[in-house]
Each structure stands twice: as C-alpha cells, then as structure tokens.
C-alpha cells in the first residue's frame, strides 16, 4: 500500500511540495518536487560496496526533460526523446557541481542521480526545482552526504533583487544568477549579467544564500521524518610508512621542479621524479602497487605546491599572486573568414573566428518552455593536441558545451540587437593550446574577433579565472590561474566583463569556510586583472571596424506592404525562387513586410531590391508605363508593364484608326507605351495606347 510523505513550504512567491514514498520506491531514495506545476522526479541510487580497484568517486548526474511534461510530442522520425540536448547537459553539470564537495573525502561508492521533468509550467524553470529535489533525495537516502544544500535563482529588476523570477520577469532582468549553498557557505554560482558592478553581484550572491536557508531548513525537517540511517563506510587507509618514504625521496626534488616556469619542461621533470620514486620503492618491495605510490605522489605534489603559495613564495611559473601571464593578441589572421583573432595568455591560446549569416542561419531551439530562435552561436572546441595528448575527435563533450556556454554568457550583454545588426553571428573558439583558463581566453578572443568582423558590440569584454589556496585562516587569492593551480586550489572563480561591469560569473568552491569577505576580495582582484587585459586589448583593436568583410553577405532591408508578400513569393514560391537564382542573393520576408536581401555582391543585391520594388509597385490609374507585348489575341494584346503585372490593350485602344488585325500593329516582345485606364476589384488592368500613339510611332 502506498504511504506518501508530503511536506510543503512557501519559497518566495511559490509553494514547494516535496513528496516521497509513492513513486520509484526501489531506488535508494526518490523525491517528487512540485513548484507551481513544474514537477521534477529525482531518484538516487547508491551502491554500498566499492568496486575493487576503484580510485575515484563515480558520481553520475543526469537531468532529462520529457516532452509529455508540456503536453507535446517529441520531434524527429521516431517521435521519441534521444540524446540529451545542450540545455539538459548544462543543467546536469549545474546540479553536479555543488554535489561533489558534499560527499566525504575518500568515498568511492557508485552513486547515480537522475532528475526527470514530468510536468512543466512555462513560467517556472525546472533547474531550481531539480536542484532542490536532488538535495532532498540525497539527504534522506542514507548515502554518506555531509548536509543538504539549497538553490535559488536571483534576478535584478528595477534595482531590486527578485527571488526565483519567472521566465517573463527574466526578460526585464539585468541579472540571471543561480546560487547553491549550504547553511554556512556558498558552493556554486552561475550567472549572466548586463554589466553589473562587483558590489551588485556580491549582494545578489548573499541575497540568494540567505533566501535558500528556508529550503535547507525544510529538507532537514524532512530528514527527521523519513531520513534513512547513514551507511557505515570506511575510507581507504593510507600507508603512513609508504607516505614517509615517498616524501623523503621526492620532496626536495619537487620543490626544485616547481621553480621551472615552462609547463612542458616542468611536467617532464616531475614525471622523471615520479618514475625514480616508483623504481626505488618497487625495488625494495615488489608487492607495492604502482597506483598506490602514484596517488601518494600526487597528494605530495599538491601539498608542496599549496604550501609554497601559502608561504609567500612565487607561483609555479614564477609570478606573484596578482600577476597576469604575458599577453599576445592579433586580429585578421585568417583572410577568408569574416572575422578572426588569436588570443594568447601564457601557455593558453584561443583561435577565434566569426561567421556572419542571415536570419535563416539562426538556430531554432525547441525547449519544454517553448520554441525560440538564437541569432548568436558560440562553439568551443578543446582538441586533445592543445594539451599535448592523443584522444578521440568527434562531437562536443559535456565540458566543451559548458565552457562554450560560459563564454557566450560573457559576451551576450554587449551584443547588438537584431535592429542594430541584422545578422546571425556564429563564433567558434578553437583552443589550440591550454594551460588553464581556456574559457576566459575564449571570451577575450571572441571580443577581439567580433570587433574585427565589424560587429558593433557595445563594449570590449575580457575574462579571467581566479583561484584560492586556503588553510584555516590563511589564504591567498590567485589571478589568472594555471591548470595545476586549478587542480590544487580550493576555488575556481571565473569572471568576465567590460570596463562598465560584470557580464558573467561562475564560481565553484571545493572547501568549507569561504566567507563573503573572501568572495569580495576575489571580485576586486578579478576586476584589476580584467582592466589590465582590456587595456592590452585596446592597443590591438579599440572599436569595431566600420565595415564588414568583403566575403561576408551584405544585408539590405526594405519594407513592402504585407498584402504584396504573395506577389514577391509567387505561386508555390516561383517568383522568389527565380529572383534568388537570377541575382545570386538570399531573400527573406517577414510577416510584417520586412524584406532582407543578402549578397556578397552589392550590385546583385541592388538588382534584387529593384526587382522587388518593381513587383510591389502600385499601378496608378492615368500613369504611362513602358510595356512589353507578351500575347496577341483577336480582341487585343496583353502588355507586361512590370515583372508581374500584365494588362490588356483592347483592339479598340490600340490606335484611333479602325484596326482589323492586331498583328498588323503589334508583335511579340515589342516595347510600347501604355496608359492605365482602370484597375478593377480583381486587380485586372485595362490599358490604352491611344494617348501615347505619337510616342509609339
């Protein structure tokens, strides 16, 4: 018999309903979360036995949307959901990021979290609902999980912070920020902003953290009612004697290796030290597993690097904690692209290209909350060669999709509107070399490439990745972190923005005790770094070029009466098809009569525009036109007075004399002058040559 446990609470303007005990009862835990009819089923399954040889935490997070949630059929031939969409992948990553720090160190059991959207209110985004459900399900599951976390979306409308704004409210918001946190600390931030200040962004994070305490309190209350006992588990025991041996053999040599600034040279040196340690220890005891030694060596490497920074020494590559790596920037490096730039920061470089297209190149996105068209595409590629590795090359991975979206968020606020720049814009960032902060290099490279392409962005944008090393009350904030510093650090904090303010912010925290003061210091230090990079970018290109590439399509816009659209299109598209083929142009017509003509050749575009004006021109009674004889019949002749307008000259209107045979006066393709006598209700045109006979002679 079903025995539901239901818990309700008010969260902002919405009531949240947490329900368990009815659906998915064979999962370790399952919670159905309802927020204003947006319902997400969250299931958690954990395995109590660790797989033999397991060396990492195998957490899987899958967020999936079902079209039945919106009362719709899936697209495609099979009418069934297929591979995850980009939106589903991004939300899966957003759920995953605050989860990982909350599992205890050394916990290696398999855990899978699946969040399925089963009902959707088009005004309530399911991502926050899913995150609340995941927190609740893990908290009651009995799986070792430190504490529940909350989630909130924060908007900024009319100088006021808004908790969980609706989709409609977000249109008017200058901020879209998602924050997840525990009762004591922020875990994750993902945001997009319209050039807000550091103070405004910090206040938004604090606001979201404070508001979601209600979620955490209610999940804790639910745990007291239905929570399962925590599993007993034991972390892998570290051999302290082996640890001492590794430290004795490697510590001094690693300290020397960390003085080598070149990444490849340093990596070779560290690999040599590791190989020597393995060889020495296995000669003493052949039963010691290589992987065990490697893990101890990696932990020692991490601790030495952290201690050096906390002790006030220079960083791995010889910089102090605020210094930015050397910068090199170039534009117009690929002659046939519509815009291009190479952005180099230390050993990280992004080759960025811009392609301009028409409205028909825009991406049509079908989401549960409705369809939309995206005119700005940004794709990020991270090939294996950029880190000196061999790997599979194919469709983008989750990481590439996530980094591309972050870079896009950083640029969106400065992109022109469709009225200001009627092009679809595609940016591709090829990471050709990587040693940290490649997503922020993509932001800088994109800004340069857009200006090179003549896209009138509102301001230049730069991005920088910040890091943190913290032990108790001692901490150091790092500007422009390397990949090693990302690995050893306690925070990954990416900030993009212009000189006017922040456009995107992403933060992931891996440790406890990150205070608001630390976040404020990191934001201020990131601003200094951003300003330095922007100043360097201005020396390369300070504003968008006044003209687009000669290889890009020129878009010309004219307005016609909506009633004339059918004339331009023609029967089954015959007129517009012939026109595009003849003039080698791309023609798009909107319902309001806006016509866009795109062509790389301006002369061809003008030819198409003249033809469209000719087709849509109003025929005025009493006006005289040049016309071509198209047909001769017994009772007169048909004269084409425009490309799609034809009128009849009756035999009695050819001349003032009596005409016995029309062919005696007119021939096919003859050019004559005609006067419009009448246009009837059906659009039929009656013409006369009488008043123009002198000219026709």
Swiss-Prot record:
For this protein, what reaction is catalysed?
A: RNA(n+1) + phosphate = RNA(n) + a ribonucleoside 5'-diphosphate
- Which part of the chain is the KH domain? 553-612
Chief localization: cytoplasm
The alphabetized list of GO BP terms reads: mRNA catabolic process; RNA processing
- What's the top EC group for this one? transferase
Q: Which UniProt keywords apply?
A: Cytoplasm, Magnesium, Metal-binding, Nucleotidyltransferase, RNA-binding, Transferase
Subcellular location per the Swiss-Prot or TrEMBL entry = Cytoplasm
Q: Which InterPro entries match?
A: ExoRNase_PH_dom1, ExoRNase_PH_dom2, ExoRNase_PH_dom2_sf, KH_dom, KH_dom_type_1, KH_dom_type_1_sf, NA-bd_OB-fold, PNPase
Q: Name one GO cellular component term.
A: cytosol
According to the UniProt entry, what is the EC number of this protein?
2.7.7.8
Please report the stretch or stretches of sequence annotated as the S1 motif domain: 622-690
Q: In its keyword annotation, does this UniProt entry include Transferase? A: yes
| Binding-site residues for Mg(2+), renumbered to this chain | 486, 492
The stretch of residues making up the signal peptide is none
Q: Which Pfam families match?
A: KH_1, PNPase, RNase_PH, RNase_PH_C, S1
* Cofactor(s) the protein requires to work: Mg(2+)
Instruction: Respond yes or no to whether keyword Methyltransferase is given for this record.
Output: no
Please give the family membership noted in the entry. Answer: Belongs to the polyribonucleotide nucleotidyltransferase family.
Q: What does this protein do?
A: Involved in mRNA degradation. Catalyzes the phosphorolysis of single-stranded polyribonucleotides processively in the 3'- to 5'-direction.
Q: What binding partners and quaternary form does the record give?
A: Component of the RNA degradosome, which is a multiprotein complex involved in RNA processing and mRNA degradation.
UniProt name for this protein: Polyribonucleotide nucleotidyltransferase
């Amino acid at each position: 018999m079903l025995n539901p446990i239901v818990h309700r609470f008010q969260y902002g303007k919405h009531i949240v309903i947490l329900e368990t005990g009815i659906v998915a009862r064979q999962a370790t835990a399952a919670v159905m979360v309802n927020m204003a009819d947006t319902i997400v089923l969250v299931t958690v399954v954990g395995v109590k036995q660790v797989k033999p040889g397991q060396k990492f935490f195998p957490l899987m997070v899958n967020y999936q949307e079902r079209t039945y949630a919106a009362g719709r059929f899936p697209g495609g031939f099979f009418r069934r959901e297929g591979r995850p969409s980009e939106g589903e992948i991004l939300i899966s990553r957003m759920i995953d990021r605050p989860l990982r720090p909350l599992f205890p160190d050394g916990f290696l059991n398999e855990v899978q979290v699946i969040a399925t959207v089963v009902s959707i209110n088009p005004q309530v985004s399911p991502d926050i609902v899913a995150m609340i459900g995941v927190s609740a399900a893990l908290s009651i599951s009995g799986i070792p999980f430190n504490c529940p976390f909350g989630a909130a979306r924060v908007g900024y409308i009319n100088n006021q912070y808004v908790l969980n704004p609706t989709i409609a409210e977000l249109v008017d918001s200058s901020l879209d920020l998602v924050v997840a946190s525990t009762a004591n600390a922020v875990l994750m931030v993902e945001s997009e902003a319209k050039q807000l200040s550091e103070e405004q962004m910090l206040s938004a994070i604090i606001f979201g953290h404070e508001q979601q305490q209600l979620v955490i309190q209610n999940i804790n209350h639910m745990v007291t009612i239905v929570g399962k006992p925590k599993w007993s588990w034991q972390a892998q025991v570290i051999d302290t004697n082996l640890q001492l041996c590794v430290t004795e053999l490697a510590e001094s040599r690693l300290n020397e290796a960390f003085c080598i600034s070149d990444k490849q040279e340093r990596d070779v040196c560290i690999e040599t030290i590791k190989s020597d340690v393995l060889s020495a220890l296995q000669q003493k005891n052949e039963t010691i597993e290589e992987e065990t030694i490697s893990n101890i060596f990696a932990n020692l490497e991490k601790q030495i690097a952290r201690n050096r920074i906390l002790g006030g020494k220079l960083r791995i590559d010889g910089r102090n904690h605020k210094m930015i790596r050397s910068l090199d920037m170039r534009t117009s490096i690929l002659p046939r692209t519509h815009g291009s730039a190479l952005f180099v920061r230390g050993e990280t470089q992004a080759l960025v290209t811009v392609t301009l297209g028409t409205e028909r190149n825009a991406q049509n996105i079908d989401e549960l909350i409705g369809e939309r068209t995206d005119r700005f595409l940004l794709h990020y590629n991270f090939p294996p060669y950029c880190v000196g590795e061999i790997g599979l090359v194919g469709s983008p991975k989750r990481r590439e999709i996530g980094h591309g979206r972050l870079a896009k968020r950083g640029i969106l606020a400065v992109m022109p509107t469709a009225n200001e720049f009627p092009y679809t814009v595609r940016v591709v960032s090829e990471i050709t070399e990587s040693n940290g902060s490649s997503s922020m290099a993509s932001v800088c490279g994109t800004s340069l490439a857009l200006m090179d392409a003549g896209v009138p962005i509102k301001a230049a944008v730069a991005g920088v990745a910040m890091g943190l090393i913290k032990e108790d009350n001692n901490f150091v904030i790092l500007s422009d972190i390397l990949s090693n510093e990302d690995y050893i650090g306690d925070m990954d904090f990416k900030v993009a923005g212009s000189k006017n303010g922040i456009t995107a912010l992403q933060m992931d925290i891996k440790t406890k005790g990150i205070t608001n003061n630390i976040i404020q210091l990191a934001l201020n230090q990131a601003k200094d770094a951003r300003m330095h990079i922007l100043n360097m970018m201005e020396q390369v290109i300070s504003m968008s070029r006044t003209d687009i590439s000669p290889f890009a399509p020129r878009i010309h816009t004219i307005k016609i009466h909506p009633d004339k659209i059918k004339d331009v299109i023609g029967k089954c598209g015959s007129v517009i098809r012939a026109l595009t083929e003849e003039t080698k142009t791309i023609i798009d017509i909107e319902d309001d009569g806006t016509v866009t003509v795109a062509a790389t050749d301006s002369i061809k575009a003008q030819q198409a525009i003249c033809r469209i004006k000719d087709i849509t021109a109003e025929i005025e009674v009493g006006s005289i036109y040049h016309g071509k004889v198209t047909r001769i019949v017994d009772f007169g002749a048909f004269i084409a007075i425009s490309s799609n307008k034809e009128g009849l000259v009756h035999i009695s209107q050819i001349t003032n004399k009596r005409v016995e045979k029309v062919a005696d006066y007119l021939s096919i393709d003859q050019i004559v002058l005609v006067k419009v006598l009448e246009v009837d209700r059906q659009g039929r045109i009656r013409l006369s040559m009488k008043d123009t006979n002198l000219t026709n002679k």
